[in-house]
Amino acid sequence: TLNQNLFLLNQYPDYIFNFEGGVKYAWMKEYYPREYELMKAFVKAGRWHVSGASWDATDTLVPSVESFIRNIMLGQEFYRKELGVESTDIFLPDCFGFGWTLPTVAAHCGLIGFSSQKLDWRNNPFYGKSKHPFTIGLWKGVDGASVMLAHGYDYGRRWDNEDLSENKYLMELSKCTPLNTVYRYYGTGDVGGSPTIASVASVEKGIKGE
């Protein structure tokens, strides 16, 4: 993950990478100290984003709220001391289920965002043909606290060095939202690593309008 993304960050000036889990950063520091220092420079430059806030991704249904908050506090303390930044979001792309307390927990911890793709795994639609209420919007908790939700569909999508403005799949998805905007993860799921070079090249072309 470190080496592949450091390569992409050096090769593509518009490439930005999000990575979660304080414990994984601690492992980087312990086992790959040279690459860890290179990564820290990209954090400072705003191109490697610390996501997720917590020490590690966690289930949100079984653990107590106190456990959830302590996980976030531990992660944020590590990020402040090691990287000089704090995360602003809860990032759970591969967590099964989200408790109704999540917006309240996020707000209590000073977080403003929440992102996942897991709602797309539902067997039955949420309403109509959709498996989730919206792709980008505010999720309001029972106490009135809210968090910005960005739902990215599946997390293993790859682009084959194509013109994304002509991608029929993206165009159809964008019609399903009031803002005509679609939010997507892209990259490599489960095994770590990075997006493919072709995927990054596709996004670079889109940014440049090519």
Regions found by a protein language model. Give the residues of each.
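Catalytic-domain carbohydrate-binding cleft regions of carbohydrate-active enzymes
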Residues: 1-210
